[in-house]
């Protein structure tokens, strides 16, 4: 298990981010998805394969989070191996290449987000099968190396259901055993995490957290 660095969130997840499974973290813009993933990688102590499809990864933000926690920012930056695929085809190649790159020195794989390029291109051709193959590679890596994989997902408005839903909901839902939704609240900096699915924890549990210089913090100030 990898700690999120937030006691209440770890408790919600049954101890933290589990190895050997895909954990989906989804939500609308600026809900803390990237910050959460970066924080988990920062605190993991090992290398992190970070696939950034949206340009949301900030070395400056990582350094700030490390420094705020009394960690060496240079050492933290060196542990993050960044990949920046420009389109869905390059994303496929990047995820495929992880089979040769990621080894036992890595503690986490993050794809942020798994559906950004998929959304852009899905109108032109059916990419659902290809997305499923990419998820299967990530699941294979998680099981082979015994590490967690976090796939960040976007949302879209479903007019039939009249609510926001994760992109490619069924494709990701089929392979992601743990699903966490992040939402904004009216109070600035305050967010809520809702457990939508888990292998052994009850669904529907929620915790509140803050976004600060340190990254993600418990509203009550409790840390692991």
Swiss-Prot record:
One of its GO terms (molecular function) is ATP-dependent DNA damage sensor activity. The keyword Electron transport does not apply. Gene3D superfamilies: P-loop containing nucleotide triphosphate hydrolases (3.40.50.300). Keywords: ATP-binding, DNA damage, DNA recombination, DNA-binding, Nucleotide-binding. One of its GO terms (biological process) is DNA repair. Belongs to the eukaryotic RecA-like protein family. RadB subfamily. This is DNA repair and recombination protein RadB. It comes from Thermococcus onnurineus (strain NA1).
